[in-house]
Amino acid sequence: MDPNTVSSFQDILMRMSKMQLGSSSEDLNGMITQFESLKLYRDSLGEAVMRMGDLHSLQNRNGKWREQLGQKFEEIRWLIEEVRHKLKITENSFEQITFMQALQLLFEVEQEIRTFSFQLI
C-alpha cells in the first residue's frame, strides 16, 4: 500500500469532516463513511495480495468476494459522481480543492483495487 495514499485518505477525511455544507451535511457524512469503508476494503485486499497465498483464505471467509468486488467498484463510481456533483455546485475554494483531491484519490484507489484483484484472480 502506498503510504501517500494512506495519508491522502486521512487528509481528505479530516478536511471533509470540517466542511459545513448546510442541508447536505448528511450527504457529506455518507460520503465520509463510504470513503472509510473503501479504505478498509482496499487495505484488506492489499494485505491479501501481500500474503499471496491468502486467496483461499479470502475465498473461504467470503465465498462471494468477486460479487463484493463488483459492489465496491459500484460504490467507487457512485462516490466519483457524488464528488463531481459537489465540485460543480460548490463555490468555496477550500471545498473545491478538497473535492478535487478526493476525486484524484478515488481514481488512484480504483486503480489499486483493480491491480490487487487481478493479482488475486
Curated annotation (Swiss-Prot):
Keyword flag Transport: yes
The keyword Transport appears for this protein: yes
Record's keyword terms, sorted: Host nucleus, Host-virus interaction, Transport, Virion
Gene3D superfamilies per the UniProt record, alphabetical: 1.10.287.230, S15/NS1, RNA-binding
GO cellular component: host cell nucleus; virion component
Residue interval(s) of motif Nuclear export signal: 12-21, 85-94
Places the protein is found: Virion; Host nucleus
GO biological process: exit of virus from host cell nucleus through nuclear pore
Pfam families reported in the protein's UniProt record: Flu_NS2 (PF00601)
InterPro entries with a match to the protein in the record: Flu_NS2 (IPR000968)
Miscellaneous information on this protein: Average number present in a viral particle is estimated to be 130-200 molecules.
Record's subunit section: Interacts with protein M1. May interact with host nucleoporin RAB/HRB and exportin XPO1/CRM1.
UniProt record similarity statement: Belongs to the influenza viruses NEP family.
Function as written in the Swiss-Prot or TrEMBL entry: Mediates the nuclear export of encapsidated genomic RNAs (ribonucleoproteins, RNPs). Acts as an adapter between viral RNPs complexes and the nuclear export machinery of the cell. Possesses no intrinsic RNA-binding activity, but includes a C-terminal M1-binding domain. This domain is believed to allow recognition of RNPs bound to the protein M1.
Protein name: Nuclear export protein
Organism encoding this protein: Influenza A virus (strain A/Malaysia:Malaya/302/1954 H1N1)
